[in-house]
Swiss-Prot record:
It comes from Thermoplasma volcanium (strain ATCC 51530 / DSM 4299 / JCM 9571 / NBRC 15438 / GSS1). GO terms for biological process: ribosomal small subunit biogenesis; rRNA processing. It catalyses: AMP + ATP = 2 ADP; ATP + H2O = ADP + phosphate + H(+). Interacts with uS11. Not a structural component of 40S pre-ribosomes, but transiently interacts with them by binding to uS11. This is Putative adenylate kinase. Keywords: ATP-binding, Kinase, Nucleotide-binding, Ribosome biogenesis, rRNA processing, Transferase.
Length: 153
C-alpha cells in the first residue's frame, strides 16, 4: 500500500473544499465516493469500506482521500476537520439534510468520534484535528504536516 493521508469530519466541515485546494497545489487528493465507484466498491449509494481498503492496497494508492469514512481506510495520517457548529448547521440545511440528520452529525463532531475511531488504528501523533476556518491555511497546514512526515522517513 502507498502512503495514504485521510481527511475526515462531519458533512459541511470543508473536506471537499480542502481537497480541491490541495489539488490546486498539485496533490493527489480524491473524494472517497469517487474512488469507491472507480474501484467497484459502491453499492446502492453505500460504500463498502472493506472493499475500498483492499482495492487501495492492491493499487498501492498514494495520495490523500477525503470523506466522512476515510479514517477507516488504512491511513498513515488522519486529518479531522471541524467547523463552527452554526456553520455546519447552515451548510447541512442548505444541502437539504433533515433536522434529525443534522443533530446526528453535530453530535458526531461534539463526541470526537472521528478521533476515537482513528485512535483505534493509528498512534495519536499521526492524528491531527484542524479547525477549518480559512481553507487556504488549512490546506497549507495539511501540506506542512505531510511534507514533514515524508522528510522524517
Amino acid at each position: 500500500m502507498g502512503k495514504i493521508a485521510c481527511i475526515t469530519g462531519p458533512p459541511g466541515a470543508g473536506k471537499s473544499t480542502v481537497c480541491s485546494k490541495l489539488r490546486e497545489y498539485g496533490y493527489n487528493c480524491k473524494e472517497g465516493n469517487e474512488l469507491a465507484k472507480e474501484y467497484g466498491c459502491l453499492f446502492d449509494e453505500e460504500v463498502d469500506v472493506e472493499c475500498l481498503e483492499e482495492k487501495l492496497a492492491e493499487d498501492r494508492f498514494d495520495g490523500i482521500i477525503c470523506s466522512h469514512y476515510s479514517h477507516l481506510l488504512g491511513c498513515s495520517t488522519v486529518f479531522i476537520l471541524e467547523a463552527d457548529l452554526n456553520d455546519l448547521i447552515d451548510r447541512m440545511r442548505a444541502r437539504g439534510y433533515s433536522e434529525e440528520k443534522i443533530q446526528e452529525n453535530i453530535e458526531t463532531q461534539m463526541s470526537s468520534i472521528f478521533y476515537y475511531e482513528s485512535l483505534e488504528r493509528l498512534p495519536a501523533n499521526r492524528i491531527f484535528t484542524l479547525y477549518n476556518g480559512n481553507i487556504d491555511e488549512t490546506a497549507k497546514r495539511i501540506i506542512s504536516i505531510i511534507e514533514r512526515s515524508r522528510n522524517n522517513k
